[in-house]
């Protein structure tokens, strides 16, 4: 099987239909861009008129749900087994969150959006101090907690079911509490196909718009002509860099690029802060944050029902639809890098840290731009923003003393954001089309990378980017229904998980007496200080634990239970007792490695020589952090019965 997976890990019912549907949609947008824009535009217009309330309510529910999960008893549950630890340090984690979630968007809209709201507010007169305050409130609202809540709820669903319940790390797993094993059938395939389409088309359209900003920056810096030909070359160059990043893997390629770009982003922001109206910007950040928090409930539910305007369809609904359509990609990427964190830690990190940085970025760039227009009278900046949002950032930076160097830094940042979006997008789509496999052949990632590049180039040549972007946002409506159902399923699963934890701690503490029986204290002491090798633990599992599991299984089968003893995984054994319609019981034992303390072994010895192993018990919810090495057969049977008794008590309470 291992050799087969080095050749291909694709899931045919998802891979092939996704490729065909992507080709069909791209051909429609390329061959008849005007017709495509009309069809998708009418769909979006219908949604704006008839379903705007649903979008607004759904995003509010997502935010409330993730906050509730963090502050409730569910917050202590880990995204993975109870013994798991985070795969990445906090800084690396934050850097990858930032790069995948908001990168190119911040560069594109950091100056443009606040200025556009300042000049043309949804209500009231533009170009005033009131309009300036309202512009920053709106910008904070669009880029703050709500956007990250959408990403967080998708990532929570995927990480919880994928890492804690060993389900595939794909969107189909979100429906497991609602439809059970049917996620592996046509319904699950359809969900994953939809996620592949949304991710490929979303990333491709973002790349198409992002390359326009790179072209604008190069035009300002080096007089590189602006045009489709140059942008196609830029896409090919960026995708070549993305290919190199993919070849080095998540732990090196994407992580290093993300950390580098976060440092560059902080540097650029600090330079603008220092060279701009520093005191005003610091005051504005504090006031903007206070105004945002004070108005968050009102803005969350504001549909301008008593002041009808087309503004909400072009801004708030556009953003909400885009965040939702973008969430399979970003949510899955966040889930991929968040294994081992508690729900409380996860929500705090995903909601507060990126949102806090984003709001600081918007203040430094947005308020600086508004200050230039409102106080310094630099009306040309407003005209440049209205003329071309891709050039807004560079028109803004050239007003500073080191404008050329700042613009050069900005171009590098946009390029790196471009690359991280492309390679993380290819990685996510590859996982979706491979049934959740985390380790897949390089050619599959390269295939999806080429598909996204070809899609972006084709749409760019045919002027079909806007049409497909509109289609992607319109597709968020049915996907929102799916997300609401999946969120309900997650809450249902968390309630059962928390109940099981409570029952386990309320029951009698686990007795170890079964394991020691009547053995002498000398033998027990020898077992405590023994530092077994892997081979010793494996032999113990094979000679003692496996027969104990088989004895329990045989007795339960006599009583009509469906029981399995799984010895297929190397060096481990697990006993599964089926409970149709209710959670199954799992008792497993496997070797777990530790490093011997320094007072026992020399630091100079080889790494392998310094390890010792324990025969640790694993239940459905993860490792239990106790060792049964050296126990007798009857002692192991007693431990199985103790754990099974607690499981049956949990099932009784949860009914």
Features from the language model and the residues they span:
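Extracellular/periplasmic helix-exit of transmembrane alpha-helices
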Residues: 109-121, 272-295, 355, 359-387
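N-terminal alpha-helical transmembrane segments of multi-pass membrane transport
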Residues: 2-131
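Helix-loop-helix module between adjacent transmembrane segments
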Residues: 5-16, 20-30, 63-68, 102-106, ...
């Amino acid at each position: 099987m291992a050799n087969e997976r080095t050749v291909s890990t694709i899931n045919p019912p998802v891979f092939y239909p996704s490729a065909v549907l992507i080709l069909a949609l791209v051909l429609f947008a390329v061959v008849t861009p005007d017709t495509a824009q009309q069809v998708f535009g009418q769909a979006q217009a219908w949604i704006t008129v008839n379903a705007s309330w649903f979008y607004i309510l759904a995003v509010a529910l997502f935010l409330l749900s993730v906050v509730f999960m963090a502050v409730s008893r569910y917050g202590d549950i880990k995204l993975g087994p109870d013994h798991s630890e985070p795969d990445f340090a906090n800084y690396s984690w934050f850097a990858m969150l930032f790069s995948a979630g908001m990168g190119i968007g911040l560069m594109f809209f950091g100056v443009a959006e606040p200025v556009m709201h300042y000049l043309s507010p949804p209500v009231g007169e533009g170009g005033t101090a009131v309009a300036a305050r309202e512009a920053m409130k709106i910008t904070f609202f669009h880029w703050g907690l709500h956007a990250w809540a959408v990403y967080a709820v998708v990532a929570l669903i995927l990480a919880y079911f994928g890492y804690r319940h060993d389900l595939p790390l794909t969107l189909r797993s979100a429906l497991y509490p609602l439809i059970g094993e049917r996620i592996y059938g046509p319904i699950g395939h359809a969900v994953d196909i939809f996620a592949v389409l949304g991710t490929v088309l979303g990333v491709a359209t973002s790349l198409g718009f992002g390359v326009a900003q790179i072209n604008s920056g190069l035009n300002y810096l080096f007089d590189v002509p602006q045009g489709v030909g140059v942008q196609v070359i830029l896409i090919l160059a960026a995708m070549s860099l993305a290919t190199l990043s993919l070849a080095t893997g998540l732990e090196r390629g994407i992580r290093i690029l993300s950390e580098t770009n976060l440092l560059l982003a902080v540097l650029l922001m600090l330079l603008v802060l220092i060279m701009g109206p520093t005191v005003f910007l610091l005051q504005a950040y504090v006031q903007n944050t206070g105004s945002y928090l004070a108005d968050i409930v009102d803005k969350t539910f504001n549909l301008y029902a008593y002041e009808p305007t087309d503004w909400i369809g072009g801004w708030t609904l556009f953003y909400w639809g885009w965040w939702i359509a973008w969430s399979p990609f970003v949510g899955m990427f966040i889930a991929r890098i968040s294994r081992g964190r508690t729900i409380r830690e996860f929500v705090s990190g995903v909601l507060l840290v990126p949102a806090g940085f984003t709001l600081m970025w918007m203040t430094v760039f947005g308020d600086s731009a508004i200050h230039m227009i409102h106080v310094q009278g630099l009306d040309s900046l407003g005209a440049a923003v209205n003329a071309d949002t891709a050039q807004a950032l560079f028109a803004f930076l050239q007003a500073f003393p080191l404008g050329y160097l700042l613009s050069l830094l900005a171009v590098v940042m946009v390029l790196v954001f471009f690359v991280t979006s492309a390679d993380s997008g290819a990685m996510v789509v590859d996982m979706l089309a491979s049934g959740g496999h985390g380790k897949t052949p390089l050619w599959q990632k390269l295939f999806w990378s080429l598909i996204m590049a070809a899609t972006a180039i084709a749409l760019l040549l045919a002027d079909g980017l806007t049409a497909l972007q509109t289609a992607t946002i319109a597709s968020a409506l049915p996907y929102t229904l799916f997300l609401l159902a999946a969120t309900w399923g997650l809450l249902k699963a968390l309630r059962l998980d928390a109940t099981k934890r409570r029952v386990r701690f309320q029951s009698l503490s686990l007795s170890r007496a079964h394991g020691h029986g009547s053995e002498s204290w000398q033998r027990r002491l020898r077992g405590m200080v023994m530092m077994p090798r892997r081979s010793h633990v494996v032999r113990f599992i094979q000679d003692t634990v496996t027969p104990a599991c088989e004895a329990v299984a045989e007795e339960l089968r006599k009583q009509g239970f469906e029981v399995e003893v799984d010895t297929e995984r190397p060096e481990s054994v697990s006993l599964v007792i089926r409970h149709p319609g209710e959670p199954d019981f799992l008792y497993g034992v496997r070797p777990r490695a530790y490093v011997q303390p320094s007072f026992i072994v020399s630091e100079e010895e080889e790494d392998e020589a310094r390890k010792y192993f324990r025969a640790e018990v694993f239940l459905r919810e993860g490792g239990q952090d106790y060792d049964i090495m050296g126990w007798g057969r009857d002692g192991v049977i007693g431990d199985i019965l103790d754990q099974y008794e607690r499981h049956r008590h949990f099932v009784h309470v949860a009914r």
